[in-house]
């Protein structure tokens, strides 16, 4: 059965004059054609994921390709049965990718148009995965890695991408003299991060051109050597990559069983992304810790209108109580 919705993933590092006004004009156009999605605009370029029917997405691609400097922008296209977004957002930011360094400033930032790692095709990247002398580094957030990753890729001990440069500096002696290849969802983070690694003194740095999204669609590699699913920042949450021998690597936060279902912790002040089944979400009140389960603003409790007696009953079932000491 034909799928009616297309999801477009794209980015482009290119100077945008008066980027704030560009963002406002871009939002107006997107709304005028009924497009849904999330787009970041900065002086350094544009990064977005949008969705709509064939006619709407075609209008959008034609519009973007008509803009100065964006004639060759590369859209990665998925076909889906449902919209990937509920609303349309276009926001101006100082950068479309922020490295999060204390010594980083916007005037002395990495410009991928000048400094970036060598581009690797899916075939070349697969060869790198099989090369025991090559270090493969996942540059994404921890919860993205936990849902799926390339076989043998290093999972940095970080929570999010902004912590990665410091982690690399702290572990410099492990990688400095080796070939390092990096990857991310669509390529936008790696463009800048691989450039930063080059500036740090790494001599042999490569990046997966087009990211995981392109690797999974390549007719030759067909996503092989990818384990799990790819995390995406829209309503789909997870998409398939490996079309040869797919596996599940995600583990339920509470019992460690195979799982590919993400939810946010019920405590709005925590909001950690956790993998869990519906059964365990109910059992543990969607709280990643005791403190989050008993938090007075637990969203799971309020959404399901649980009484205090019901909360106490569920806590007792897992050996906890309202007044016990926090375990985090």
Swiss-Prot record:
GO terms for molecular function: oxidoreductase activity, acting on paired donors, with incorporation or reduction of molecular oxygen. InterPro entries: Rhodanese-like_dom, Rhodanese-like_dom_sf, Rhodanese_C, TrhO, TRHO_N. It is an enzyme of class 1 (oxidoreductase). Its EC number is 1.14.-.-. It comes from the Bacteria. The active site is at residue 184. The keyword Coiled coil does not apply. GO terms for biological process: tRNA modification. It catalyses: uridine(34) in tRNA + AH2 + O2 = 5-hydroxyuridine(34) in tRNA + A + H2O. SMART domains: RHOD. Residues 130-224 form the Rhodanese domain. It holds the Pfam family Rhodanese. Keywords: Oxidoreductase, tRNA processing. Belongs to the TrhO family. Catalyzes oxygen-dependent 5-hydroxyuridine (ho5U) modification at position 34 in tRNAs. HAMAP family: TrhO. This is tRNA uridine(34) hydroxylase. It comes from Streptococcus pneumoniae serotype 4 (strain ATCC BAA-334 / TIGR4). The lineage of its organism: Bacteria, Bacillati, Bacillota, Bacilli, Lactobacillales. The gene is trhO.
């Amino acid at each position: 059965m034909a799928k009616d919705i297309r999801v477009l993933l794209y980015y482009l590092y290119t100077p945008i004059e008066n980027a704030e006004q560009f963002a406002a004009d871009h939002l107006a156009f997107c709304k005028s054609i009924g497009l849904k999605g999330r787009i970041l605009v900065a002086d350094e370029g544009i990064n977005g994921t949008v969705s709509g029917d064939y006619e709407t997405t075609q209008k959008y691609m034609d519009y973007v390709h008509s803009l100065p400097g964006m004639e060759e922008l590369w859209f990665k296209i998925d076909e889906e049965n449902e919209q990937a977004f509920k609303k349309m957002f276009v926001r101006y930011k100082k950068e479309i990718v922020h490295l999060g360094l204390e010594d980083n400033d916007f005037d002395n930032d990495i410009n991928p148009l000048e400094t970036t790692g060598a581009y690797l095709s899916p075939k070349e990247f697969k060869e790198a995965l099989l090369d025991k002398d090559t270090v493969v580094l996942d540059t994404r957030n921890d919860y993205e890695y936990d849902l799926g990753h390339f076989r043998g890729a290093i999972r940095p001990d970080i929570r999010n991408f902004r912590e990665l440069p410091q982690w690399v500096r702290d572990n410099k002696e492990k990688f400095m003299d080796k070939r390092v290849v990096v990857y991310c969802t669509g390529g936008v983070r790696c463009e800048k991060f691989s450039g930063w690694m080059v500036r740090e003194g790494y001599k042999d740095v490569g990046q997966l051109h087009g990211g995981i999204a392109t690797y999974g669609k390549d007719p030759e590699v067909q996503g092989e050597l990818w384990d799990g699913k790819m995390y995406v920042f829209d309503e789909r949450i997870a998409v398939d990559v490996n079309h040869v021998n797919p596996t599940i690597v995600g583990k339920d936060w509470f019992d460690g069983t195979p799982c590919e279902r993400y939810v946010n912790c019920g405590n709005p002040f925590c909001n950690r992304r956790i993998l869990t089944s519906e059964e365990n979400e109910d059992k543990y009140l969607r709280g990643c810790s005791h403190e989050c389960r008993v938090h007075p603003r637990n969203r799971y409790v309020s959404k399901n209108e649980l009484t205090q007696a019901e909360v106490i009953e569920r806590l007792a079932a897992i050996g906890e109580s309202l007044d016990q000491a926090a375990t985090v």
